[in-house]
């Protein structure tokens, strides 16, 4: 009997998840179907309940429903509780298990696919939204020299740092970054989605080995263009993170971790 999974979000027409999970299933010999659901802003819980009633085994969750997915869970993981967001659900009888694989997907892409271990490195995170919340624990676990978070709303970043309470995690401002040096700079703001550049001083890239843009499929965004102009050798967008977090969810559901490299290669667009 074929198992059913789906991604839910709004809008959902842009999603790559059915393609990704279809490739995972084909290469790992798993019998499943994976669809896409345009969620209702007024009745997310009803959408999930209907999918479960039809025999659904699990769901990926994307914007704007990650908080609601977390709230719906009967058993959220530690990562989901910290992020106050879930990007994957698993249904086992009456139990609704929730996970957040965004951070571990980002970490795997940076360390495994891009060959940039974070241990002992100075890392700058631009933004303090859900993706950053999900990344903090996995990043801190590998022992960076420093993890610095900057957000337009400094109070939001400060509250998150206080919540984590880790000595390697600190909060700065865009103005205070002048003259600071980092090994890795990650843009997790929404600026690139609208073709804008976060107000980051150009010299933060002076010693950076990697500039990483969480948005994907946007080509050379203003953030990546600035990094390139400043001589950063390695540029990446978020397609690898997308595939790696999908692989984590697939393994959680199926007990088999699929190969990700062929899928990343298929989806990667030139950064030009």
Short names for language-model regions:
Residues 62-66, 70, 129-131, 190-193, ...:
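Short glycine-rich anion-binding loops that position phosphate/pyrophosphate groups of nucleotides
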Residues 2, 119-122, 207-208:
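Phosphate-coordination loops involved in phosphoryl transfer and adenosine-cofactor binding
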Residues 2-114:
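Phosphate/diphosphate ligand-binding glycine-rich loop within oxidoreductases
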Residues 142-164:
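NAD(P)-binding Rossmann-fold cofactor-contacting core
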Residues 166-235:
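Rossmann-like adenosine-cofactor binding region
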Residues 9, 100-103, 110, 114, ...:
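Glycine-rich adenosine-cofactor-binding loop
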Residues 120, 214-272:
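Adenosine-phosphate binding glycine-rich loop
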Residues 12-13, 154-155, 218:
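Helix N-cap at the beta1-alpha1 junction of Rossmann-like dinucleotide-binding domains, i.e.
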């Amino acid at each position: 009997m074929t198992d059913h999974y789906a991604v839910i979000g709004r809008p959902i027409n842009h999603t790559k998840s059915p393609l990704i999970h279809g490739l995972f299933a084909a290469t790992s010999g798993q019998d499943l179907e994976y669809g896409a659901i345009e969620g209702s802003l007024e009745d997310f819980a009803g959408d999930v309940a209907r999918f479960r009633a039809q025999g659904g085994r699990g769901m990926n969750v994307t914007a704007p429903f990650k908080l609601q997915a977390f709230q719906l869970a009967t058993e959220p993981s530690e990562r989901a509780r910290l992020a106050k967001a879930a990007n994957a659900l698993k249904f086992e009888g009456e139990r609704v298990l929730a996970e957040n694989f965004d951070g571990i997907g980002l970490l795997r892409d940076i360390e495994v696919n891009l060959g940039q271990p974070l241990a002992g490195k100075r890392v700058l995170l631009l933004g303090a939204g859900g993706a950053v919340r999900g990344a903090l624990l996995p990043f801190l676990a590998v022992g960076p020299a420093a993890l610095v978070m900057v957000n337009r709303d400094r109070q939001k970043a400060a509250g998150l740092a206080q919540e984590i309470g880790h000595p390697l995690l600190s909060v700065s401002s865009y103005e205070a970054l002048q003259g600071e040096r980092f090994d890795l700079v990650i843009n997790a703001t929404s600026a690139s989605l609208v073709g804008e550049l976060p107000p980051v001083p150009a010299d933060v890239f002076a010693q950076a080995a990697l500039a990483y843009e969480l948005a994907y499929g946007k080509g050379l965004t203003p953030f990546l263009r600035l990094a390139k102009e400043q001589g950063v050798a390695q540029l990446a967008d978020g397609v690898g993170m997308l595939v790696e977090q999908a692989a984590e969810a697939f393994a959680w559901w199926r007990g088999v971790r699929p190969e990700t490299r062929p899928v990343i290669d298929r989806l990667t667009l030139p950064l030009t």
